[in-house]
Amino acid sequence: MNMKVYYSPTSPFVRKVLVAAAELGFEMERLPSAANPVTRDQTVVTTNPLGKVPTLFTDDGMVLYDSRVICEYLDALAGGNRLFPAAGTERWERLTEQSLADGMLDAALLMRYEQVIRPGEMFFEPWQRGQLEKVTSSLDRLEAWAPGFGERVDIGTISIACALAYLDLRFPEEGWRRHATLAAWYERFSARESMQRSEHPLPA
């Protein structure tokens, strides 16, 4: 197979795709991009009008985005029902876990943009606080769910692990690891080869 993906080394959504691909036994060529919410990479825009990563090029000429679509495509390509349960309560629970993790990441990314993109004199503290509250309440819910994660490797646990890794990268000062059950689970999951191979670079 010759799949290619536009990526950014610090994107948690790209990492989710890379982890899913590795767990399913797929390799893909990584195409560097300068994806940015303000100055968009026009090379990416020509194939994904949102100008966002990840954007996947499949063997048969399709262009897929975003991470949720790409991960489900990869699972189907691998025969299905490995990362995404086919039906029933289990499917909806895994999709809800993915949704919570992705929503927490959306809030964390908005916090990051407020810090590094918005001019300092325009910094809006109530906005930043509101996003942090979303992250905090999400972590509380994940802590409650963590005893049920066990050794599962699916779209729910992959999404959650990638979200926690991003908090480590950009917001270590927020101390998410005080959620002890969640932190213990993450230590085990983050040791997986798929997580190690896709690890974010250390911040400059």
Describe each PLM feature range.
Residues 81-86, 177, 196-201:
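Short, hydrophobic secondary-structure boundary micro-motifs
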Residues 1-125:
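GST-like domain detector, emphasizing the conserved glutathione-binding G-site
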Residues 1-2, 144, 204:
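Basic/polar N-terminal segments that are highly enriched at the extreme N-terminus
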Residues 59, 161, 201:
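Conserved residues at the C-terminal ends of beta-strands
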Residues 34, 202-203:
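Residue-level "edge-of-site" marker
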Residues 101-187:
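GST-like fold's C-terminal all-alpha helical module
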Residues 184-200:
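Charged phosphate-binding loop/patch that engages nucleotide di/tri-phosphates or the phosphate backbone
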Residues 71, 75, 95-98, 139, ...:
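Non-transmembrane alpha-helical segments in soluble domains
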